[in-house]
Amino acid sequence: MSTLRVDTVMTTELVTVGPDDTLGEVREVFDTHRFHHLLVVEHFKVVGVISDRDLLKHLSPFVGKLSERAQDAFTLQRKVHQVMSRNVVTIRADTDIAQATRLMLDHGVSCLPVLDERQHPIGVVTWRDLLKAVAHCGLDPLCRLPNSAA
C-alpha cells in the first residue's frame, strides 16, 4: 500500500545559518523569510536547529526600543552555537508522514531536517507541514498535495 511520504510535504527551499553566525543575522533571516526553523549547517552537515522561539528567548526584549541599552544590543552578537538545539532528530525523504509524526512526538521536536544518503540537508518537515497534509488528504494514501515534490 502506498503512503504519503515526507518528500510530498517537506519544504525544499532551504536557508541555513552557520554556528558562528550571530543572532542578529538570524533575526534578519527570520524577518526576510517566513520560516520558523533554520538548520545550522557546517561542512554540509546539520549540526543544529534554531527556531524563532529560541531567538526570542535569547534576545533582550528591549532591542530596537527607545529603552535599549548596550547590554540589550549585545544580545544580537551572541553566536548561533550558543543557543541552537544540538540534539537534532533527522529523517529521510522516503519516510512516511506517520513515522515522521511519531518521531516529532517521541522526541518533542517541531521540525525534522530531511537528509539525503550523504547526510546532507535537502529539506525540512515541520508539524505545520504534517498538519496541512492531514487536513488536505485525511488518511488517503493516494492523495497528492498541491505543489508536492513527488
Q: Model regions: which residues?
A:
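Short, flexible active-site loop motifs that bind/organize anionic cofactors or intermediates
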Residues: E13-T16, K45-V46, T90, H120
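Short, surface-exposed, polar/charged, turn-prone segments marking secondary-structure boundaries
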Residues: H37, F44-K45, L66-R69, L76-R78, ...
